[in-house]
Amino acid sequence: MIKIYDTMTRSLRKFVPLTENTVNIYVCGPTVYNYIHIGNARSAVAFDTIRRYFEYTGYQVNYISNFTDVDDKIIKAATQAGVSPKELSDRFIAAFIEDTKALGVKPATQNPRVMDYIAEIISFVESLIEKDFAYEADGDVYFRVEKSEHYAKLANKTLSELEVGASGRTDAETALKENPLDFALWKSAKAGEVSWDSPWGFGRPGWHIECSVMATEILGDTIDIHGGGADLEFPHHTNEIAQSEAKTGKTFANYWMHNGFVTVDNEKMSKSLGNFVTVHDMLQTVDGQVLRFFLATQQYRKPINFTEKTIHDAEINLKYLKNTLQQPLTETADEQELKQFVIAFQDAMDDDFNTANGITVVFDMAKWINSGSYTEPVKSAFEKMLAVFGIIFEEEVLEVDIEALIAKRQEARANRDFATADAIRDQLAVQGIKLLDTKDGVRWLRD
């Protein structure tokens, strides 16, 4: 039985899906104006692991993670780069996909983009105005926070406790509002900015409305799980709840999950401290699987500290697990012992996806395997556990097999059977083997 720590109730709750054997998850994705940093990677890896464990236990998972491709930061970065916002966002969406693939993150069921939902966003805002939850002011549209019952319940705050500047508001914006806490649903466009026509003039969506619309359009008025980084709890997720529930009159999400922060050498990551690390740069020197394994060593809600030592430790531990998988199979293993490992693993992961405890079970099992208990059922169970963490080792092609295929290719070439020769080259290439035809014969290397 899976239990989830729900940020809304500040408690551990049994997971009960809206639809039996199916879980709908929406996770806030990146604002695509730069390469993602290790903090973004933590969110991607954490929720990918959660998704994988749901699948491990037999759930069908609809996993939605958006790309915010309409935002002030994108407009500013695009202007500085001399390209359109779409060109910039396309570039960094491709980079995000490449980086997260290197981290072993499975593709989402859907990756909606804000630009594809402008009409739906306008319709959503119109509905809020009709219900008197929103108002237009000089081409902008704002949400009436005071009309939202229990506003900021997710952040466990009251209206009086909230700071006026929590969303980075300017004096000009505040002057247009009925209440300084009201937030923008639609922003009027400045000259030359990307914009769309609307009943309130040309403009673009506010940040918070984007996720509400994409989540409800794809998954319905109520979703099982909404997730993201702890920094999104307020104001982003708080405002999503307010506007979504104002429109539908229904609970927006049944469970709210937030992953913890990443520190670098026990300091908050920031550009001013010079410890801001992008995944793109890190992957030049650190294997993606090592980075992923490091991110799994702490339970998703807890902070995790990035250091050279923690990465080195992750690399050593991964090698140990890989060597364990390559042990020769044995004829027998204690089936009851195997069953106990599986139960212990599930108990750990059922407890709010406690990867730290789950990994402890994996290493205990590896020790047992290395003592001489490694049948096919044991190997299968072990591989399935590792796959929950996104750890999937490709079996290396043995040298004897490579040489045999090269000999077969040479024979085909001698017989002028170039189709077979090319097919063998392609087969080896897929397996990471590159052939070099030299005057001294064929050389090969692992790509």
Swiss-Prot record:
Localization annotation: Cytoplasm
InterPro entries: Cys-tRNA-ligase, Cys-tRNA-synt_Ia_DALR, Cys-tRNA/MSH_ligase, CysS_C, Rossmann-like_a/b/a_fold, tRNA-synt_1_cat_dom, tRNAsynth_Ia_anticodon-bd
Binding site for Zn(2+): C28, C211, H236, E240
Pfam families linked: CysS_C (PF23493), DALR_2 (PF09190), tRNA-synt_1e (PF01406)
GO terms for cellular component: cytosol
Keywords tagged on the record: Aminoacyl-tRNA synthetase, ATP-binding, Cytoplasm, Ligase, Metal-binding, Nucleotide-binding, Protein biosynthesis, Zinc
EC number assigned by the record: 6.1.1.16
MF terms (GO), sorted A to Z: ATP binding; cysteine-tRNA ligase activity; zinc ion binding
Sequence motif 'KMSKS' region, residues: 268-272
Name of the top EC class for this enzyme: ligase
Primary location group: cytoplasm
Binding site for ATP: K271
Catalytic activity: tRNA(Cys) + L-cysteine + ATP = L-cysteinyl-tRNA(Cys) + AMP + diphosphate
Gene3D superfamilies: Anticodon-binding domain of a subclass of class I aminoacyl-tRNA synthetases, HUPs
Domain of life: Bacteria
Locus of motif 'HIGH' region: 30-40
A single BP term in Gene Ontology: cysteinyl-tRNA aminoacylation
Keyword flag Ligase: yes
Cofactor, how bound (note): Binds 1 zinc ion per subunit.
SMART domains xrefs: DALR_2
NCBIfam families, per database record: cysS (TIGR00435)
Name assigned to this protein: Cysteine--tRNA ligase
Organism: Streptococcus pyogenes serotype M1
Record gene name: cysS
